[in-house]
Swiss-Prot record:
Top-rank lineage group of the source organism: Bacteria
Keyword Ribosomal protein: no
Biological process according to GO: pyridoxal 5'-phosphate salvage
GO CC annotations on file: cytosol
Assigned keywords, A-Z: ATP-binding, Kinase, Magnesium, Metal-binding, Nucleotide-binding, Transferase, Zinc
Disulphides: none
PANTHER family with a match to the protein in the record: PYRIDOXAL KINASE, PYRIDOXINE_PYRIDOXAL_PYRIDOXAMINE KINASE
Originating organism: Escherichia coli O157:H7
Biological function: B6-vitamer kinase involved in the salvage pathway of pyridoxal 5'-phosphate (PLP). Catalyzes the phosphorylation of pyridoxine (PN), pyridoxal (PL), and pyridoxamine (PM), forming their respective 5'-phosphorylated esters, i.e. PNP, PLP and PMP.
Catalysed transformations (reactions): pyridoxal + ATP = pyridoxal 5'-phosphate + ADP + H(+); pyridoxine + ATP = pyridoxine 5'-phosphate + ADP + H(+); pyridoxamine + ATP = pyridoxamine 5'-phosphate + ADP + H(+)
Gene3D superfamilies linked to this entry: 3.40.1190.20
Name of this chain's protein: Pyridoxine/pyridoxal/pyridoxamine kinase
Family of the protein in this entry: Belongs to the pyridoxine kinase family. PdxK subfamily.
């Protein structure tokens, strides 16, 4: 094995601004398959750690793949430190997780990582389900999020359904959703961005609500009728990119929403069932 060892000079190691931990597909534009190119468009470096590796989303007539084994998953995380590739790390984002054990492994890694990176921004998209589909992850994941990842996160981006699951509160009107989000805030968890609050259906409006201890900001966007998948993953990629580029939270959320709308319309114009990223006007 020693004869195969070529690269041992850690001063030459690639560095990343972001580690993105979520699903990956061979075909399609969800999870890291859309987040990584979106982050790179913003001029940031990212390492992608897969939680599941799938042929495509389950919305096609064939579907292959599954969750990454725990041994592999923990090894992927450990290898980033063994390569000394995290010296400039600024943020870790999480999306779709394959198993509750992955969440625990990730939390242990993040806890250790924060000792060397006390200012690390941890943003969690607690992917659990939605109003139309219900829970579409394994049933032990919501509790794993509550127990392991929420205590480490500075910000989370649940939809209404996920907010209800995490808090046990009804969130179908704006005031109750805001109250539920506030109940999650802590010394560590500084903000909740609700990505699908109730808007005006007649006016084709959708709301994104930014909740902090001191303020509530309701951002309205046009609703685009579509079955496109991966829009939430794209939103989170744009949001973390905006924050790392120095945008204030409300501005970063607003810009992320506008970018998602732009990508959705561009994709529709090109008659694709998978998101297509147009060039980014402002890198």
């Amino acid at each position: 094995m020693s004869s195969l060892l070529l690269f041992n000079d850690k001063s030459r190691a690639l560095q990343a601004d972001i580690v993105a931990v979520q699903s990956q597909v061979v075909y399609g534009s969800v999870g890291n398959s859309i987040a990584v190119p979106a982050i790179k468009q913003n001029g940031l470096n990212v390492f992608a750690v897969p939680t599941v590796l799938l042929s495509n989303t389950p919305h096609y007539d064939t579907f292959y793949g599954g969750a990454i084994p725990d041994e592999w998953f923990s090894g992927y995380l450990r290898a980033l430190q063994e390569r000394d590739a995290l010296r400039q790390l600024r943020a870790v984002t999480t999306g779709y997780m394959g198993t509750a054990s992955q969440i625990k492994i990730l939390a242990e890694w993040l806890t250790a990582l924060r000792k060397d990176h006390p200012d690390l921004l941890i943003m969690v998209d607690p992917v659990i389900g939605d109003i139309d589909s219900g829970i579409y992850v394994k049933p032990d994941l919501p509790e794993a999020y509550r127990q392991y990842l929420l205590p480490l996160a500075q910000g989370i981006t649940p939809n209404i359904f996920e907010l209800e699951i995490l808090t046990g509160k009804n969130c179908r009107d704006l005031d109750s959703a805001i109250a539920a989000a506030k109940s999650l805030l802590s010394d560590t968890l500084k903000w909740v961005v609700i990505t699908s609050a109730s808007g005006n259906e007649e006016n084709q409006e959708m709301l994104v609500v930014v909740v902090t201890a001191d303020s509530v900001n309701v951002i309205s966007h046009s609703r685009v009728k579509t079955d496109l998948k991966g829009t939430g993953d794209l939103f989170c990629a744009q949001l973390i990119s905006g924050l790392l580029k120095g945008k204030a939270l409300n501005d970063a959320v607003h810009r992320a929403g506008l970018r998602v709308l732009e990508v959705m319309r561009y994709t529709q114009q090109h008659e694709s069932d998978e998101l297509i990223l147009p060039p980014l006007a402002e890198a």
